[in-house]
């Protein structure tokens, strides 16, 4: 499919040090496309985002994916320093309070990346436990969704997929705790009938594709479901979102 529009989007939306949902998705997509194609333009865009955040002193846990990528690609201390500063602000051990879905997405994948790459895996258990504790506190059994509905459930599902992807499955107990929650939330979202919108569908399908790639779910069962939902997005006029999700699924 035609992804030229995405390269045009990157040219028109240069990093400005102000993190947003749009920046999050652009960086996420660039990291994936760089892994698939090796194209330097995608790597350069992510590193430019990391540089803009460091320069503006605007680093936040949800932009951790850009900083960890830049650190892995360059080894430069400025990215490590920014990551360490954010972790110091958060505190190494997650709060005992129940975290809403948006905070799960912002904070826990960052914490997991830190533990796996810089923190010697010392706090992997509390990170995985926070997902489990927040899930039990937020889960609406009657609706089969996270409290707040489909959007909140999709946010939590993508946070889980990101954290599972970062956690080594050798740490089986903690890895499995997150996988079990992921599967419950995914089933709930797929069972919830509602009109698609690009934000919720994008998070759901990105998390579903990640589950297939990580072998958490059966591709023969779930990829056809994803294809139907992508087609529904395209029919509803969200062609660019459908293109991105098609490219993501086609790489599996």
Task: Tell me what each language-model feature is.
Residues 30, 53, 90, 134-135, ...:
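Buried hydrophobic core positions in alpha-solenoid tandem helical repeats
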Residues 2-25, 29, 33-85, 194-252:
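CBM-like carbohydrate-recognition segments
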Residues 120-161:
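Loop-centered beta-sheet repeat module
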Residues 20, 24, 60-71, 99-104, ...:
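Aromatic-lined, polymer-binding surfaces characteristic
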Residues 155-194:
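Oxyanion-binding "anion nests"
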């Amino acid at each position: 499919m035609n992804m030229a529009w995405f390269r045009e989007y990157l040219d028109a939306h240069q990093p400005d040090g102000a993190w947003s949902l749009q920046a999050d998705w652009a960086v996420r997509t660039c990291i994936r496309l760089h892994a698939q194609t090796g194209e330097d333009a995608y790597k350069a865009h992510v590193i430019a985002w990391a540089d803009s955040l460091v320069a503006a002193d605007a680093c936040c846990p949800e932009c951790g994916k850009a900083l960890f990528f830049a650190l892995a690609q360059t080894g430069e201390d400025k990215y490590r320093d920014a990551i360490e500063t954010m972790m110091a602000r958060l505190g190494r051990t997650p709060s005992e309070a129940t975290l809403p879905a948006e905070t799960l997405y912002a904070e826990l994948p960052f914490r997991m990346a830190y533990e796996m790459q810089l923190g010697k895996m010392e706090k992997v258990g509390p990170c995985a436990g926070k997902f489990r504790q927040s899930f039990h506190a937020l889960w609406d059994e009657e609706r089969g969704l996270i409290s707040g509905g489909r959007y909140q459930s999709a946010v939590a599902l993508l946070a889980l997929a990101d954290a599972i992807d970062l956690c080594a499955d050798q740490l089986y107990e903690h890895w499995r705790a997150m996988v079990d929650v992921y599967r419950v939330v995914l089933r709930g979202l797929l069972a919830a009938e509602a009109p698609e919108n690009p934000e919720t569908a994008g998070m759901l399908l990105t998390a579903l594709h990640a589950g297939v790639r990580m072998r958490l779910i059966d591709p023969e069962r779930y990829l056809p479901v994803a294809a139907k939902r992508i087609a529904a997005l395209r029919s509803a006029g969200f062609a660019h979102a459908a293109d991105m999700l098609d490219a993501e699924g086609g790489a599996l």
